[in-house]
């Protein structure tokens, strides 16, 4: 009796075959091609952050959310006055951009504050202010990572630029492609080796973690914007600006600087 073969063909399983009893298909040869599924919504039935009864942007004072914002995805508070999420493809793209920018902003905000915090507590490692640190590469001695010459000693801005392009490009390509074998279904939440703490093991808890990530990420993006403005206006790091404000809140605040700010000075 001849046997039938069902060949599962995909980027992850290319070349593998699964034998199927002939009683199911007779003499037929069935070929099935596996494609990456779209990311599933993170709706959580018991969470206040999802579904039609979720928390909205103004609480009980919120108006009726747009029909296309159904509470399926994390961070949906029913607010879209500009209609940016009306088109499903644009909505999916913007969701991905927001999550990626949120993660970079959280890392960036920590990187802006932590070196300055260490320097203010006596740790010596060169320039601690985030927007001044990179310029040390143009100094005669170059740039020592963490102020330690035994770590990475950089002297060429072109070499750093090339490393950034190659390394970050490779990481982003790895993410978009779903890993080396294309086995990752959702590039935003790949799981597996990218989740060593097992945060995604419990679907209910994972749905809430996604909301927390976006909340903190949105705050981090606003923080980074504030750090940029502070750097342009005051020429100081975020912690030094905070210390100045606490020491003299009347003369060191956004209003005082806005009314006295002269570009280029």
UniProtKB/Swiss-Prot annotation:
Domain of life: Eukaryota
Chain segments annotated as transmembrane: 99-119, 151-171, 219-239
Keywords for this protein: Acetylation, Chlorophyll, Chloroplast, Chromophore, Magnesium, Membrane, Metal-binding, Phosphoprotein, Photosynthesis, Photosystem I, Photosystem II, Plastid, Thylakoid, Transit peptide, Transmembrane, Transmembrane helix
Cellular compartments annotated: Plastid, Chloroplast thylakoid membrane
One GO location term (cellular component): photosystem I
Positions with a binding annotation for chlorophyll a 4: 216
Similarity section: Belongs to the light-harvesting chlorophyll a/b-binding (LHC) protein family.
Name of the protein in question: Chlorophyll a-b binding protein M9, chloroplastic
Organism encoding this protein: Zea mays
């Amino acid at each position: 009796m001849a046997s039938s073969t069902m060949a599962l063909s995909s980027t992850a399983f290319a070349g593998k075959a699964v034998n199927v009893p002939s009683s199911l298909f007779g003499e037929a040869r069935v070929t099935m091609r596996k494609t990456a599924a779209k990311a599933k919504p993170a709706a959580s039935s018991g969470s206040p952050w999802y579904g039609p009864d979720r928390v909205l942007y103004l609480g009980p004072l919120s108006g009726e959310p747009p029909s296309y914002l159904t509470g399926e995805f994390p961070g949906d508070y029913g607010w879209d006055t500009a209609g940016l999420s009306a088109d499903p493809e644009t909505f999916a793209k913007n969701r991905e951009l927001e999550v990626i920018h949120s993660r970079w902003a959280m890392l960036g905000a920590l990187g802006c504050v932590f070196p300055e915090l260490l320097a203010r507590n006596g740790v010596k490692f060169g320039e601690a202010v985030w927007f001044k640190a990179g310029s040390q590469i143009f100094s005669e001695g170059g740039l020592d990572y963490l102020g330690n010459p035994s770590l990475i000693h950089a002297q060429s801005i072109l070499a750093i630029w090339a490393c950034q392009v190659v390394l970050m490009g490779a990481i982003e390509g790895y993410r978009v492609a779903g890993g080396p074998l294309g086995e990752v279904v959702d590039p935003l939440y790949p799981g597996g080796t990218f989740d060593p703490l097992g945060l995604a093991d419990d679907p209910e808890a994972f749905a809430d973690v996604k909301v927390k990530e976006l909340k903190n990420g949105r705050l981090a993006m606003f923080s980074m914007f504030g750090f940029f403005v502070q750097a342009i206006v005051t020429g100081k790091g975020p912690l030094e600006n905070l210390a100045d404000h606490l020491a003299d809140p009347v003369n060191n605040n956004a209003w005082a600087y806005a009314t006295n700010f002269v570009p280029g000075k």
